[in-house]
From Swiss-Prot:
GO terms for biological process: purine nucleoside catabolic process. Keywords: Glycosyltransferase, Transferase. It comes from Aliivibrio salmonicida (strain LFI1238). Its EC number is 2.4.2.1. One of its GO terms (molecular function) is purine-nucleoside phosphorylase activity. This is Purine nucleoside phosphorylase DeoD-type. A purine D-ribonucleoside binds at residues 5, 180-182, 204-205. It comes from the Bacteria. Homohexamer; trimer of homodimers. SUPFAM superfamilies: Purine and uridine phosphorylases. The keyword Calcium does not apply. Belongs to the PNP/UDP phosphorylase family.
């Protein structure tokens, strides 16, 4: 039945849901990548859709910005609607010298400055990691599609405009590839509820070098990321 944040019914969602932050991006994915699409929810304009990709049922839904927002939607999708696999599809700002604009980054693990995971783990650190099966499948599909990917740790930040600019140097030293705002929270919720999760990101800007994609290049890199995510989804 419907929840306070998702006005859908059990069975409306596929077992695998792709989740961008922007609900309009979810709409774009549904209209441009899926077939036989049905809109299944729209509370607070957080749109969700279910359709097919190459004949297999797939859903897509926005999750908003930041760990508190995404955790609400991920929790309800898994706990109330029986979703088994969450694949976040979004963008990140690179901090590592080996990462270039338009690269696809797959978050094997996610560090964070958020306290949300510690609150849910008796104030201990939680190792927020992707499901290995999803990770392995995504890497294999990327290689098959000749899409260059970087696999490693990302950093899920609470602040978009952070005053701690020196932290980026520390991130690079520790091998962190890029910064998003949700992966660590999604991984924790999925682990808590016995589901699987993965984060696939496209590099839209390089924080340390001050580089940014043009709108045209941003769309191309997004399409590459989405193809990897969808090809992964239909293998599950």
């Amino acid at each position: 039945m419907a929840t306070p944040h998702i006005n859908a019914q059990v069975g409306d969602f596929a077992e695998t849901v792709l989740m961008p932050g922007d609900p309009l991006r979810a709409k774009f994915i549904a209209e441009n990548f899926l077939e036989d699409v049905t809109q299944v929810c729209d509370v607070r304009n957080m749109f969700g859709y279910t359709g097919t990709y190459k004949g297999k049922k797939v859903s897509v839904m926005g999750h908003g910005m930041g760990i508190p927002s995404c955790c609400i939607y991920v929790h309800e999708l898994i706990a109330e609607f029986g979703v088994k696999n969450i694949i976040r599809v979004g963008s990140c700002g690179a901090v590592h010298d080996d990462v270039k604009l338009m690269d696809v980054v797959i978050g094997m693990g996610a560090s964070t400055d958020s306290k949300v995971n510690r609150i849910r783990f008796n104030n201990h650190d939680f190792a927020a990691i992707a499901d290995f099966g999803l990770l392995e499948t995504a890497v294999a599909q990327a290689r098959k599609l000749n899409v260059p990917v970087k696999v490693g740790n990302v950093f899920s930040a609470d602040l978009f405009y952070s005053p701690e600019t020196d932290l980026f140097d520390k991130m690079e030293k520790l091998g962190i590839l890029g910064v998003d705002m949700e992966a660590a929270g999604i991984y924790r919720v999925a682990a808590d509820l016995g589901a699987k999760a993965l984060t696939i990101l496209t590099v839209s800007d390089h924080i340390k070098r001050g580089e940014k994609l043009s709108s045209e290049d941003r769309q191309k890199s997004f399409n590459d990321m989405m193809t990897v995510a969808l090809e992964t989804a239909i293998k599950l």
